[in-house]
Amino acid sequence: MSLDASFPWIFSLMSVFLVSIISLIGLAVISMSEERLRRLVLILVSFSAGALLGDAFIHLLPEAAEESSFGMEMSGGILFGILIFFVLEKFVHWHHCGAAEIGECPKAFATTNLVGDGLHNLIDGMIIAGSYLVSVPLGIATTFAVIFHEIPQEIGDFGVLVHAGYTKARALKFNFLCASVAILGAVLVLLIGGQLPGLSQLLIPFTAGGFIYIAGSDLIPELQKETRLGRSAIQLAGFLLGLLVMAGLVFLA
């Protein structure tokens, strides 16, 4: 394997390992009061929504359009991404536990949430690796978007498990094991991508569709629940900052 050919492997595995480490963020919030945690998660969710939409519209879709015209194939890929994430949310009950739900998710949901989170992380690994197969800058931008989304997500997952009766150490362990499934997703795409050169071009619009769905269906509706002017302004600032960070990553190209 040449040095250039090894770049997607090196960067992909480093990135998914970093994403897996994010699952241990529960350590940083164990001592926080529930009210402070709610406020923090709402800010992180707003930033995450901006980052996901920014990656979709500033990085992924322009990259896909450069490789091929914006036709039915790309539109179909975007819609397929939206559909798959909708099905995961609908039938596997994977969803993004927001600030309003910390400490309120039913105990029966915890095990199902772990399964859904594992599938979610598998897809995260696949889309990160698929992005690196296209280019290193695109992979870095997608990794940042995934990380920004994972931070509030993992805090919510940690809260669900603790509320379900898991000890904090056990909750962190299961969160990390679920997050590590991203490594498997990345390896699968890297192995298959070597045999199917067009795979990465299919994953890019799929990823964009998934990011648009997550931001539009899960994150932004969560932000709309906040009606107080001051906190709404903070959320807007977080959302815009997420967009700006993604725009700034354009200069990596």
Identify the function of each model-found stretch.
Residues 1-253:
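Intrinsically disordered, metal-sensing/regulatory segments
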